[in-house]
């Protein structure tokens, strides 16, 4: 049902976009995404399969997160061109497909269905972001080639294109490694992260919100289905948490800093992936989507483009609501109680300890402590003496979304049991 709704709205708005005003297309896109989300919730815990397309618990949890990010993105954007909303809708369709299949050919189609709109969205404001978007496109094409080659080797090793087919030997291991490279690019795992800082810095802030939340959720849904070698996952965890956190320390622009932060968080998610616990990964992603979405929603009200760190100074004095919301987002990303980010990291780290992955666990703990320097620096900057920069508060609905995300982060921090049973039923 979710697939049908997204497909119908995508095709219908492609045809009607030329006659409807842009705001009409935006409202219709929001309606389509909301209906897709409602259908997902109404069928929660009820598996469905049709050929290679299969809705299961993993699909439902990660599609939910992707749709939340898509709704937030469309709500924040004020574009005079209807194509923007169509691109988000088509990307959301690709994300749902990616999360809802084990078949490598359909997975490849889904990857391209979500990637092509993202390349266009990254170049939406031409000029400073064009070079970064070109890098994103070229590296994305290379990652797709790795994935395709991995699928071919997987078929050669197992005689099947369905993930989970039994296999062994060096050809099978190489196939899984190449699939991991292709999906690791979308998840922004180091060392496949080189596009992330430039694209985040050069793209419009709502587009960055979409990339940092929805795309990451869909990528990890696919990664969860790939039985990647534990040694390879451990290496990706180590590289991501070290590169992401250390590089973030030297940044002077907020979106670029959060890009490196997202690389580090991809490493923590990969730690949950390493243990094979879908519930821990799903909860971590939920808290990450809420906190990261909240941070970028605040940044989008400061500037739709680049946001130097100085622009955050004194935000609380200019707008107490946005200042407090940004502080909540930073503290949740850091993983401090009583916010939801604490339980996300706790579940991932506890599962790693239970699995005996002490090496990567210690590294994750140390780098998480290092991240306190820049998260607290960003969060407390909002209380400093304000810079003399123009500031115009966003519309009421955007502020309401900020409040809702902040309240959810606090509520899930105090009562994580509100969603853990549902995630267990889904995952």
From Swiss-Prot:
Signal peptide: none
Membrane topology: Multi-pass membrane protein
GO CC annotations on file: plasma membrane
Keywords: Cell inner membrane, Cell membrane, Membrane, NAD, Quinone, Translocase, Transmembrane, Transmembrane helix, Transport
Catalytic reaction annotation: a quinone + NADH + 5 H(+)(in) = a quinol + NAD(+) + 4 H(+)(out)
A GO molecular-function descriptor: quinone binding
Enzyme class at the top of the EC tree: translocase
Chain segments annotated as transmembrane: 1-21, 30-50, 57-77, 79-99, 104-124, 137-157, 172-192, 204-224, 230-250, 257-277, 280-300, 322-342, 360-380, 400-420
Primary localisation category: membrane
One GO term of the biological process aspect: ATP synthesis coupled electron transport
Domain of life: Bacteria
InterPro entries named among the record's database cross-references: NADH-Q_OxRdtase_suN/2 (IPR010096), ND/Mrp_TM (IPR001750)
Subcellular location: Cell inner membrane
EC number: 7.1.1.-
Family: Belongs to the complex I subunit 2 family.
Subunit structure: NDH-1 is composed of 15 different subunits, Nqo1 to Nqo15. The complex has a L-shaped structure, with the hydrophobic arm (subunits Nqo7, Nqo8 and Nqo10 to Nqo14) embedded in the membrane and the hydrophilic peripheral arm (subunits Nqo1 to Nqo6, Nqo9 and Nqo15) protruding into the bacterial cytoplasm. The hydrophilic domain contains all the redox centers.
Free-text function comment from the UniProt entry: NDH-1 shuttles electrons from NADH, via FMN and iron-sulfur (Fe-S) centers, to quinones in the respiratory chain. The immediate electron acceptor for the enzyme in this species is menaquinone. Couples the redox reaction to proton translocation (for every two electrons transferred, four hydrogen ions are translocated across the cytoplasmic membrane), and thus conserves the redox energy in a proton gradient required for the synthesis of ATP.
Protein name from the UniProt record: NADH-quinone oxidoreductase subunit 14
Source species: Thermus thermophilus (strain ATCC 27634 / DSM 579 / HB8)
